[in-house]
């Protein structure tokens, strides 16, 4: 897996650490990140516009509501969805921002289950 769609809660204000980490992963691990049209204006330039045939997985940054909204995109693009919890409590998210790099490594090694 090299190509990740990025979907996040547009009301989340502390996006700089997220984008800094994604930029590091883009540069160091040769990962590509894509935005969705409904959130295009929220992203820095290194995150490209979505290319449907290139997407391997969607990363949802936020809470359970954001994850549920992103699940529609996961079905539309027929790719797995991984939730990155940005709050204190997230029942549907499998990872946190501090675990993101390891979680992506696990995805690349096919160490995940689709449910």
Question: What spans do the regions from the language model cover?
Answer:
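Glycine-rich loops and low-complexity Gly/Arg-rich segments
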Residues: 29-33, 59, 84-86, 106-110
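Short, glycine/serine-rich, charged loops/turns that create anion-binding
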Residues: 11-12, 86, 96
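Gly/Ser-rich helix-loop-strand patches that form or flank binding pockets
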Residues: 69, 73-87, 91
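Catalytic core of DAGKc-family lipid kinases
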Residues: 91-115
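Glycine-centered flexibility sites
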Residues: 5, 62-65, 83, 87-90, ...
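Residue-level signature of transmembrane alpha-helix interfaces in integral membrane proteins
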Residues: 19-21, 25, 78-79, 99-106
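N-terminal glycine-/serine-/threonine-rich phosphate-binding loop
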Residues: 1-62, 66-76
